[in-house]
């Protein structure tokens, strides 16, 4: 009887210990503000994950490079010092050349075309293209189309000649600015404001969300509405960490991630115009609108960058991205109907 009693006590203790086990800590690090689409997506992931897996997980969100800057975060992920990141798509060139497709200038007509490509089979393949490097991709978060800013108006490519532009660590972006005889400078995102303010660089490229939330428009005299490229993110995890999670935890986190990505992209779509208007209302930088002819000149000047990186990226991927610019027939009819009513 005494042995049975001891066994029962041991079982009760083990059940109690399991019930009171500390939650799995998940560190989600990023380099932008909470108010941006990526920041909002990260907070939504925390909210949904902790609701779906009560007591099992605790998501700690670190915005604004609080934990790791954009120059160190990938290394930290692979070392297991952080579990989830959402780096800019420009950061993946050293892990797979194919993701460089998102840096090609004037590839996508608008953010809807980006979404169509990313949701296609070709776009989905890129999420699993780095598993051999220890990176697991969940999905894509949009920020917006990029605008050019500088301390002088940029209307034609020759206006950029000789200017120093901050870029991310991307060979494609480096080639993009060299194509217009500008001087690209690789600078960490957290250092961009100071670099612009002090004149270390003359200009930069950013979507409206980053321009406003990081106050770049306060230290740049002009913003050219170029929509020349995409700034987006891939939400990723350490592949080994992800594969080692229990199935129920993976299921809950996958559901939370899907909801958070959809939410982040909804915020991006809604807030892009709002951030643009806020920049205009602040009246600290002048907006430069390109004519169709001027925009065509920028496109023509930067288009050779495609051919330079076609072999690395793959012509099939580039063709699929170009095809995504074709709007579905249903969308075309809806737009025509609205146009007829005007």
Where are these regions (language model features)?
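Absolute protein N-terminus
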Residues: 1, 21-22
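N-terminal secretory/targeting leader peptides
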Residues: 22-113, 121-342
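Sec-dependent signal peptide recognition
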Residues: 2-9
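Sec/Tat signal peptide C-region and signal peptidase I cleavage site
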Residues: 15-21
